């Protein structure tokens, strides 16, 4: 997907201090202060334009959500939506997922969502996949013991790779679906990509994976 450059995005987001966090490293260990409560904290890595995370935040007002989207030209769409329809339990970051440990203390995040991540199909790019072992170690470092990853994709290759990567890492699966929309849960929040690929008849793959507590 080719990203459309939006030169105004950075300045616009920085003006929305109640939504966009410019220096998340300053909040490491203190996100409950930012939200003004100690509700569970869920993050989505690769939030796109925010349809999923905003839907989740509306559905679960007693949970705090952080949308993480590397590209400002994409993340600005989330910020705009939050300006139009304020949601006090959502914040937005434009940071690299490799550095999550710089922004969250161990156990500070209660759940990680990975939705329709870039599959990076070439073998030489495997390390860039968000379910590669180094990324799994990063998520494990900020989640509590037995922390969860919820994952959705339309790409069977990435799904099979992720099952293998997580299994080899020592994780176990509490749910696996090879066609989510056959018996779609009532509370499922669809992403933009999910709606698009489902309309084309493409099955949606989903799993919930849990880290095994280490002694």
Swiss-Prot record:
Enzyme class label: transferase
GO cellular component, one term: tRNA methyltransferase complex
Catalytic residues, chain numbering: 118
Pathway connected to this protein: tRNA modification; N(7)-methylguanine-tRNA biosynthesis
Reaction(s) the record says it catalyses: guanosine(46) in tRNA + S-adenosyl-L-methionine = N(7)-methylguanosine(46) in tRNA + S-adenosyl-L-homocysteine
Chain residues that bind S-adenosyl-L-methionine: 44, 69, 96, 118
Assigned EC number: 2.1.1.33
GO terms for MF: tRNA (guanine(46)-N7)-methyltransferase activity
One Pfam family hit: Methyltransf_4
Keyword annotations from UniProtKB, A to Z: Methyltransferase, S-adenosyl-L-methionine, Transferase, tRNA processing
Residues the entry annotates as binding substrate: 122, 154, 191-194
Bridged cysteine pairs (disulfide): none
Family, similarity comment: Belongs to the class I-like SAM-binding methyltransferase superfamily. TrmB family.
Protein function: Catalyzes the formation of N(7)-methylguanine at position 46 (m7G46) in tRNA.
Protein name stated in the entry: tRNA (guanine-N(7)-)-methyltransferase
Organism: Exiguobacterium sp. (strain ATCC BAA-1283 / AT1b)
Name of the gene encoding the protein in the UniProt record: trmB
């Amino acid at each position: 997907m080719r990203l459309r450059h939006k030169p105004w995005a950075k300045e616009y987001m920085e003006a929305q201090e109640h939504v966009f966090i410019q220096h998340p490293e300053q909040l490491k260990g203190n996100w409950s202060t930012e939200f003004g409560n100690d509700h569970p904290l869920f993050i989505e890595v690769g939030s796109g334009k925010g349809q999923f995370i905003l839907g989740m935040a509306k559905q679960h007002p007693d949970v705090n959500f952080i949308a993480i989207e590397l590209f400002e030209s994409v993340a600005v769409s989330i910020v705009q939506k939050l300006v139009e329809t304020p949601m006090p339990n959502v914040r937005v970051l434009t940071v690299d997922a490799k550095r999550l440990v710089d922004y969250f203390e161990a156990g500070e995040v209660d759940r990680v969502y990975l939705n329709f991540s870039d599959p990076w199909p070439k073998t030489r790019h495997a390390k860039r996949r968000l379910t590669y072992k180094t990324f799994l170690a990063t998520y494990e470092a900020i989640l509590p013991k037995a922390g969860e990853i919820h994952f959705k994709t339309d790409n069977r290759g990435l799904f099979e790779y992720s099952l293998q990567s997580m299994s080899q890492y020592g994780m176990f699966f509490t749910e696996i679906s090879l066609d989510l929309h056959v018996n779609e849960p009532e509370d499922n929040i669809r992403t933009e990509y999910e709606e698009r690929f489902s309309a084309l008849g493409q099955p949606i793959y989903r799993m919930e994976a849990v880290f095994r507590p280490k002694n």
